[in-house]
Amino acid sequence: MGVEGCTKCIKYLLFVFNFVFWLAGGVILGVALWLRHDPQTTNLLYLELGDKPAPNTFYVGIYILIAVGAVMMFVGFLGCYGAIQESQCLLGTFFTCLVILFACEVAAGIWGFVNKDQIAKDVKQFYDQALQQAVVDDDANNAKAVVKTFHETLNCCGSSTLSALTTSMLKNNLCPSGSSIISNLFKEDCHQKIDELFSGKLYLIGIAAIVVAVIMIFEMILSMVLCCGIRNSSVY
């Protein structure tokens, strides 16, 4: 016997929320893949300074995001099917998956909050090491290539950790082509550009996580209400 009245409204409301959840999973998966293959981050995080690769903490978060997006699409489909079929078993499984996903999202949010400054800090340290090697050693071709990639990708020049007045002559050939010594002195600091690059992407991820968390809370409530409604309707 199918559900009636308010429970039937909850059934279709849950279906709509699950469809939105499925779409959100697709959007998160798409955004994560875009962040993974974004030319700016790819150019910088694929670099190597000698035997030392660029910090990959950012990519760890992206891989987690890809997995979350894929799981969300599966769970959203499961919720849609469970709601239409009025299956207590499927709805119970759906609720359990939501609880696990919500716990993982909270854990990922805590990890992201703790590491939000560390990601940019690690990249800036990597850049500073390459810049110091390139300035001190004329034969440090690998370091020069790393520095040039940073400068061309971010359209910046140099770091505040080195004096612009004492190193402008040495940095001139490392800055974007066409830059003069005078313009390089006033070009934006690479540390600031690195902060802007990663803070913008982390802000986007944070907004997406909050929206998904709100949807998940509503879905957990609706799935339990619908499950109870199905159980009560089967009694009568």
UniProtKB/Swiss-Prot annotation:
**Superkingdom in the source lineage:** Eukaryota
Keyword match Ribonucleoprotein? no
Q: Give each disulfide bond as a residue pair.
A: 156-190, 157-175
Name a GO CC annotation attached to this entry.
Answer: immunological synapse
Per its record, what are the GO molecular function terms? cholesterol binding; integrin binding
Post-translational modification note: Not glycosylated. Likely constitutively palmitoylated at low levels. Protein palmitoylation is up-regulated upon coligation of BCR and CD9-C2R-CD81 complexes in lipid rafts.
Transmembrane ranges, per UniProt, are 13-33, 64-84, 90-112, 202-224
Question: Which family does this protein fall into?
Answer: Belongs to the tetraspanin (TM4SF) family.
What's the stated role of this polypeptide? Structural component of specialized membrane microdomains known as tetraspanin-enriched microdomains (TERMs), which act as platforms for receptor clustering and signaling. Essential for trafficking and compartmentalization of CD19 receptor on the surface of activated B cells. Upon initial encounter with microbial pathogens, enables the assembly of CD19-CR2/CD21 and B cell receptor (BCR) complexes at signaling TERMs, lowering the threshold dose of antigen required to trigger B cell clonal expansion and antibody production.
Supply the name of the protein: CD81 protein
Q: Which organism is it from?
A: Saguinus oedipus
What gene, per UniProt, encodes this protein? CD81
